[in-house]
Amino acid sequence: MHDAQIRVAIAGAGGRMGRQLIQAALGMDGVQLGAALEREGSSLLGSDAGELAGAGKTGVTVQSSLEAVKDDFDIFIDFTRPEGTLAHLAFCRQHGKGIVIGTTGFDDAGKQAIRDAAQDIGIVFAANFSVGVNVMLKLLEKAAKVMGDYTDIEIIEAHHRHKVDAPSGTALAMGEAIAHALDKDLKACAVYSREGYTGERVPGTIGFATVRAGDIVGEHTAMFADIGERIEITHKASSRMTFANGAVRSAIWLKSKPNGLFDMSDVLNLNNL
């Protein structure tokens, strides 16, 4: 292994996203797949991670114990569920390993645990790791500053039938970007559901609508609607590889950061645009 390479460990190796992450790690220059993890009792334990992902034999077998592979990776990549991610986060903090977190659905306590851990280790935490989505978030900030005070703002998102949290983390990130640009607190202005006799739309609110159907990878639209015209800013993902490649790219970037909490805008240097 060349000194410039970083070794990554992939959580949830047998899942849809886990397999894509393995493919991305194996296909990206400067990266070595060091470990792959699955939950205790999984039928996939002992499988070759590369074969599991359809990328050929790698010699890296799927394990259930982080302790057993702690010397095999530099950066941990986790797109699982909040309770599992927080356990992995605690391990990484204890052992000085950076972590890339793509898990969504954290409550306030979980988000605080991530902030606390960032005092000791480097963390990239993002709702969406695609380059396109993060460019969209920057566009939303600019659109909100120009149009947000006098338009009705709605965010519509669609995902596959298996997604367990709603609204999506990306939809919430869109709302946060818009609210921040307008000096608002999203918790105070978000409307997550409408049913029955709701009365007229309350000015200054940000509405959310959710679709769960079929195999939709991810579609997000922000609408700025006025009387007579509206602007819609949309991102559509057709492959999870865009998220996987972004996450592995983040791991490479994170290797040089001893501690701190970052997101994709830092990785892509979007804050200077």
UniProtKB/Swiss-Prot annotation:
* GO CC annotation terms, alphabetical: cytosol
| Record: residues binding (S)-2,3,4,5-tetrahydrodipicolinate | 160, 169-170
Q: Which residues bind NADP(+)?
A: 39
The record, for Pfam families, names:
DapB_C (PF05173), DapB_N (PF01113)
Q: Which InterPro entries match?
A: DapB_C (IPR022663), DapB_N (IPR000846), DapB_N_CS (IPR022664), DHDPR_bac (IPR023940), NAD(P)-bd_dom_sf (IPR036291)
- State which pathway it belongs to: Amino-acid biosynthesis; L-lysine biosynthesis via DAP pathway; (S)-tetrahydrodipicolinate from L-aspartate: step 4/4
Localization (cell): Cytoplasm
Binding positions (NAD(+)): 12-17, 38, 102-104, 126-129
Query: Which key words tag this protein in UniProt?
Result: Amino-acid biosynthesis, Cytoplasm, Diaminopimelate biosynthesis, Lysine biosynthesis, NAD, NADP, Oxidoreductase
Q: What is the protein's major site of localization?
A: cytoplasm
Its BP terms in the Gene Ontology are: diaminopimelate biosynthetic process; lysine biosynthetic process via diaminopimelate
Q: What is its EC number?
A: 1.17.1.8
PROSITE patterns associated with the record: DAPB
Described purpose of this protein according to its UniProt entry: Catalyzes the conversion of 4-hydroxy-tetrahydrodipicolinate (HTPA) to tetrahydrodipicolinate.
Q: What HAMAP family has UniProt attached to this entry?
A: DapB (MF_00102)
Q: How does it assemble?
A: Homotetramer.
The similarity comment for this entry is: Belongs to the DapB family.
User: Would you tell me the protein name for this molecule?
Assistant: 4-hydroxy-tetrahydrodipicolinate reductase
Q: Please spell out the taxonomic lineage of the organism that makes this protein.
A: Bacteria, Pseudomonadati, Pseudomonadota, Gammaproteobacteria, Enterobacterales
